[in-house]
């Protein structure tokens, strides 16, 4: 039985009712759970298995029975590893019901169904004597995230030791160490603070007001694939430094809040702006099985990994994982240090779920510190990517080139700016526009831009919450409609076609509206690629460490078909891929005729060798009709695409990705000959529908 759910269509801005399977929420939760990514992490799987084998063997040699508790069993793979290694009993718990039911089927299929006691509860809800007959003396769990403690590991381990484990219980992993490395990066700080905006001649157009300069920003982590940060875009100022250790085995409770003040020495002059963060775990009690999430330059096994992965780029020789990444934390007030060897104090905090940092020239007093938070509206309103966009020099220059020409071409230019947080619209006032009206429906964004306009003494700027507020006499005076475009509700690049929807609304008010529109057009491009790793998030597992997990694949595939969009947004600069052809234009949209339905189709010949496991998609915005490359602002590659080589992507926007279904092992040989990508696209702008279809075929096959 179908049901209806209300969703916001980002392209039309309207709430619409969408027919869904009655189990849609279930399918969405399964498809987005992300278990598959972990199961492709060969290092994690092998080291958990080795730790279980060594630990259980040592317990056996000591004459101890082995009673295992697996918290958050997922597919049941750790429970099966424990039994294979010789455990006497295994109890596993899983609170996510679809996963628990799948785990039971997987256990049955692998011959372990009657040997694992599966409890469909959270570990903190388990009752001794009811759910478990006795306490366990070996805990195996994967309760960690990028921040280590963000999924509640502290509380879960404390409860387990108090209620579920014996006094002498061992844990896998046994310990964790968190690392910090101070760094300076003009690139990364663009994700956190607002710079001045200057004209093409270097004249200052907009200065950030005091509220932005004094704001500490958000303490929340910025999780990234740190190894993909261009090596020439940052300087590390200190060696990697242990900041916190977590002993998961000790009976004594792990503290929920701690402070650690470290005296560190810089290796080169610079400004302490960022903290690079990662962690390392010792899976067994002896610390023989180490797993590090360090970026490649700080990885303890880099030399060995480089030898065994000599064909890969250096940044990709360390094991890839998307469930445990690295993080950037931004220092509230960057600390300038002038001499190599100079010392400073790094103040590190954690509570039960998160970490935060600060830097000081002199030793600060040890005292409880609250997490810093945004007080300027910028960080609470916009994403890291959007803040980076606002600072992006090359991008801004292309818009400013258009705006300078537009403003100076008329004796008095009157602009209507459509979009959220458009500083460039404010800049047009500083360039000499007669008046600027900014559409700003969001309160915090409107308040921020109002403060910037006031600080820069822009007297001819006004704000409206909707286009319907504009009176006919105001619309009649407008000479230019401008947008980047950017809207807060947008996820995929073409969601910003909401710009076209707003133009249609304006035409409804004044059908004869005659103005210059920028961007005047947009084009969607596609590029077939070979992802080095990203495709694994949608690739079937098959078998893992000798266990058959095809039932898990089937469950995820069924749910993905119901709940996962055919195209999803990904920051591709973090996920290397090789181009297999030149980009091809799929769709051209003219904003002076936005309401027209469009359909097109074609074929892309793959000209470079490699497995096509995805298609990257993006939008190029054409600012003016002059066809100059300087009039194009792209959300795709930042350099010319060369088939067979890695693509360099814009780092301040997410691209669209369509994953090509990965064949099973027995089909890969056949599919390797498929060298053509058929595509089709259907666009219905008034309904906010944009649908893609892609399929691989060999040149001898007929297209459908």
Swiss-Prot record:
Superkingdom: Eukaryota
Pfam family of the protein (one): PrmA
A GO molecular function held by the record: protein-arginine omega-N symmetric methyltransferase activity
GO process terms (BP): peptidyl-arginine methylation
The entry's keywords: Methyltransferase, Repeat, S-adenosyl-L-methionine, Transferase
Record carries keyword Methyltransferase: yes
Gene3D superfamilies (UniProt xref): Hnrnp arginine n-methyltransferase1, Vaccinia Virus protein VP39
Residues in SAM-dependent MTase PRMT-type domain copies: 14-356, 366-704
EC number: 2.1.1.-
Functional summary from the UniProt entry: Essential arginine methyltransferase that can both catalyze the formation of omega-N monomethylarginine (MMA) and symmetrical dimethylarginine (sDMA). Specifically mediates the symmetrical dimethylation of arginine residues in the small nuclear ribonucleoproteins SmD1 and SmD3.
Record-stated family: Belongs to the class I-like SAM-binding methyltransferase superfamily. Protein arginine N-methyltransferase family. PRMT7 subfamily.
UniProt name for this protein: Protein arginine N-methyltransferase 7
Source lineage: Eukaryota, Metazoa, Ecdysozoa, Arthropoda, Hexapoda
